[in-house]
């Protein structure tokens, strides 16, 4: 049985519509539902919250984040 290796592109396709954390180069975190992204890592989030130093600073309905500012994207566990 051979296991297929998952590429970063595969991972990103799988998490569309799920809660994510987007960490920027500046250290700011955006948490929300991943609406879409492109090959340049430009990201559209829904139900977005902005965290600075771990503290909630703002809430946005929709947010667009330019890809060159993104340090990483990770999945976020759903809140109960």
Swiss-Prot record:
GO cellular component: a single term: U4/U6 x U5 tri-snRNP complex
Highest taxon in the source lineage: Eukaryota
Keywords: Acetylation, Cytoplasm, mRNA processing, mRNA splicing, Nucleus, Ribonucleoprotein, RNA-binding, rRNA processing, Spliceosome, tRNA processing
UniProt GO MF annotations: protein heterodimerization activity; RNA binding
Modified sites of kind N6-acetyllysine: 59
KW rRNA processing (keyword) present: yes
Subcellular location: Cytoplasm; Nucleus
Reported function: Plays a role in pre-mRNA splicing as component of the U4/U6-U5 tri-snRNP complex that is involved in spliceosome assembly, and as component of the precatalytic spliceosome (spliceosome B complex). The heptameric LSM2-8 complex binds specifically to the 3'-terminal U-tract of U6 snRNA. Component of LSm protein complexes, which are involved in RNA processing and may function in a chaperone-like manner, facilitating the efficient association of RNA processing factors with their substrates.
Subunit structure: Component of the precatalytic spliceosome (spliceosome B complex). Component of the U4/U6-U5 tri-snRNP complex, a building block of the precatalytic spliceosome (spliceosome B complex). The U4/U6-U5 tri-snRNP complex is composed of the U4, U6 and U5 snRNAs and at least PRPF3, PRPF4, PRPF6, PRPF8, PRPF31, SNRNP200, TXNL4A, SNRNP40, SNRPB, SNRPD1, SNRPD2, SNRPD3, SNRPE, SNRPF, SNRPG, DDX23, CD2BP2, PPIH, SNU13, EFTUD2, SART1 and USP39, plus LSM2, LSM3, LSM4, LSM5, LSM6, LSM7 and LSM8.
Protein name per the record: U6 snRNA-associated Sm-like protein LSm6
UniProt lineage: Eukaryota, Metazoa, Chordata, Craniata, Vertebrata
Primary gene name: LSM6
């Amino acid at each position: 049985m051979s296991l297929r290796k998952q590429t970063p592109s595969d991972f990103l396709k799988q998490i569309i519509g799920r809660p994510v954390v987007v960490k920027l180069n500046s250290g700011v975190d955006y948490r929300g539902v991943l609406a879409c992204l492109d090959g340049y890592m430009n990201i559209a989030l829904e139900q977005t919250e902005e965290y600075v130093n771990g503290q909630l600073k703002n809430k946005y309905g929709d947010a667009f984040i330019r890809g060159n500012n993104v340090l990483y994207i990770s999945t976020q566990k759903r809140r109960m």
